[in-house]
Amino acid sequence: MNSEFSLAYGNVDSDYALDLLERLDSNWKGTELFTHIRETFQIGLGNVIIVSEQSESLRIPPSLLGSSSPADSDNSPPGTPTNEAQPWFISEDLSKGPFTEAQSTQSSIETLEGEHHAVSSLHLKLNGLSCIGRAVWRATRKMDTRTEVDDILNSITEPRRLTLPGINKMRQCIVRLLLLVPIQVREEILSFAIASGIPSETIEDIRSSTNISAVDTNGRGIAHNSKKRSLAPTQDSRNLRRRIRGHTQ
């Protein structure tokens, strides 16, 4: 394969991007491909697919993207670490668009009456929700609320079909996740999502659902009913804010 590569990518959260780089570092370190990715890869750009000048494509093995599916194990480089169970929107490979299969499913298209703009809108919305979901999932891994986070994630039905009920189910679960993290962290995650290109209407929809309209100078959330919610920072929230700021600068 030619040494010149180009990258195509979708939006992912910064922690996920760093995790991917670490796995590439441990498995493909020293290879020409890794060197190029290391020089090109930026925080927030993920779901990598590498395309050579000859239009040959080299997909990053799904196991390196976080999938724990047994079907992916044969494609993994030696020494690939075993990953903990992850929700589908963490491990799903969105590098070619989230709905490659669903677009060819007649029932899915009929659900939206074949309207292309509606399909595109749902693509953006689910991709945006997935990005926020990944950010929250990564952010809460070491927090006391992780058991509750896992319970919520286990209730998510994979919306692989292009249906509004599936999208709404995903949105409801993301809202529940965001309510588990400190207000300051919640706003930082939403701000990062906006910077990642998620449609502003999706962000505003979620922000209104979490009943937060602003954050005052003391870091307290101001709810829509104008009652202030006090929040005593915990060590978890301090560490989390520091980590998010470091990854998104």
Curated annotation (Swiss-Prot):
Keywords of the record: Plasmid, Plasmid partition
Record's function text: Plasmid partition require REP1, REP2, and a cis-acting DNA sequence (known as STB).
Ranges of Low complexity composition bias in the record: 67-77
Gene Ontology terms: biological process: plasmid partitioning
Highest taxon of the lineage: Eukaryota
Chain residue ranges for the region called Disordered: 61-86, 217-249
Species assigned in the record: Zygosaccharomyces bailii
Bias type Basic residues, positions: 240-249
Protein's UniProt keywords contain Secreted: no
Disulfide bonds: none
Record flagged with keyword Cell inner membrane: no
Protein name listed in UniProt: Trans-acting factor C
